């Protein structure tokens, strides 16, 4: 049986699928065009940094946590917080662009459509320009973080590797910095 790929991966490879899903989300009012809102953009960017700061704090203070609760790790929550930091940064960008997305997947779809879909070749996507492009790798970062967040949130296991938590945190830091740079333009 063929393993089903996440939608965001399909969108990166197939612009027709991206366009169809984007239009379907709009028709269902999951994605709505709204007036651009810099105040809402700022609120979500502040929340992104808030979540990222606490995720960093949790990793840095793991030894202190272990003094209180022996051998307990919270790397699952680091992954969750790092993903939500990325999600709020994505929402900040959407509010600036004049979009509201009702689901996490619709948020990623809108990012792909509005920020990634402006170029003809994948190689061209690597640069940020005045048309607010995100690279394919940055879309992958939030997509992978979403998958990790789902595993960390819904898995019965509490043991997640420090390396996976730190990788998600690093992805979140890069993604949020990129969004912050875009919002400052």
Report residues per predicted region.
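Terminal alpha-helical segments
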Residues: 1-185
